[in-house]
């Protein structure tokens, strides 16, 4: 028997080995590929199609994984004109997050051709990912945390700004920082994508996801980093969401497979929990 852990990462380059293997193939994944026609979808369908499903909530109910709760923080876009925008001549002018969001959304809504819709959608997402108000909120959030916490940032520069210790491909101290975080000598670490899967951090009880992307797979993988505790413990995942923006739809999409009773929505303006996003 061959066990393919994280089988959603299968590539066509693995075909020669799999074709020549005469035994049973068992694939294991928490996020099977869903995009039909993609390389990874084809590989999973060919060599280890889904035969049995066991959800995260079934695993927590059966004490295989520790329990969890998700707190969605409903943030407002900033109206302060401190967002630098570059002109064609290389100089800068300043807008606010609110004004910039109105502009990129207007461009998206006015786009007619599919390629233009796709382009303006990506540009809107990139704009939202660069807004600094989430960074300020994260810093205030982790300042009040006494346990080990990982922050999933949007960019390498953002990860470096948020925590004193970061983990990403251009940081030469990444492996050292991960070691310090794993053994408990530091309790805060920011990263981008590389800790989304395949890395287990002992005693990791808290995580912050700055941007959900509307991607259920990425969100599941990141929350999965918090499900390695003793089954009697509970992990907390914080997800930041800009209120009254497309960010709400992205977060809802990313969390659609999770137990709704374990999700709470916090409004920091009134310091109260609300019923829905």
Language-model segments: which ranges?
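Walker B catalytic acidic pair
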Residues: 5-6
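Post-DEXD/H (motif II) to motif III coupling segment of the RecA-like Helicase ATP-binding lobe
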Residues: 9-70
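Catalytic P-loop NTPase motifs of RecA-like helicase/translocase cores
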Residues: 9-11, 34-35, 198, 216, ...
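Conserved helicase ATPase core of P-loop NTP-dependent helicases/translocases
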Residues: 148-153, 157-199, 218-219
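A short beta-strand element within the Helicase C-terminal
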Residues: 188-192, 196-213, 218-221, 234-240
